Amino acid sequence: MARENKKELIGKVVSDKMSKTVVVEIVQRKMHPIYHKYLKVSRRVKAHDEREESKLGDKVKIVESRPISKEKRWRLVEILERSK
């Protein structure tokens, strides 16, 4: 039986102070249903970084995974752009 496609998100690392965990902020543009104005909606998720290779400010790709801890349900796949 084939596995279903997992969600992939791109965001920016805003915290790397925890062991093997990074906090990634995802910013999306959504249109207001009545006023038809675009709004920036951001959310922060904790992602598992096994090799601890991402740093503060990096642009990363994360993918949905099984629950790793109470709040971690995402896994770091790759670093798209390093911070300067």
Swiss-Prot record:
InterPro entries: NA-bd_OB-fold, Ribosomal_uS17, Ribosomal_uS17_bact/chlr, Ribosomal_uS17_CS. GO terms for molecular function: rRNA binding; structural constituent of ribosome. The keyword Ribosomal protein applies. GO terms for biological process: translation. Keywords: Ribonucleoprotein, Ribosomal protein, RNA-binding, rRNA-binding. Gene3D superfamilies: Nucleic acid-binding proteins. GO terms for cellular component: cytosolic small ribosomal subunit. It holds the Pfam family Ribosomal_S17. Disulfide bonds: none annotated. PROSITE patterns: RIBOSOMAL_S17 (PS00056). One of the primary rRNA binding proteins, it binds specifically to the 5'-end of 16S ribosomal RNA. PANTHER family: 40S RIBOSOMAL PROTEIN S11 FAMILY MEMBER, SMALL RIBOSOMAL SUBUNIT PROTEIN US17M. Part of the 30S ribosomal subunit. Belongs to the universal ribosomal protein uS17 family. HAMAP family: Ribosomal_uS17_B (MF_01345_B). This is Small ribosomal subunit protein uS17.
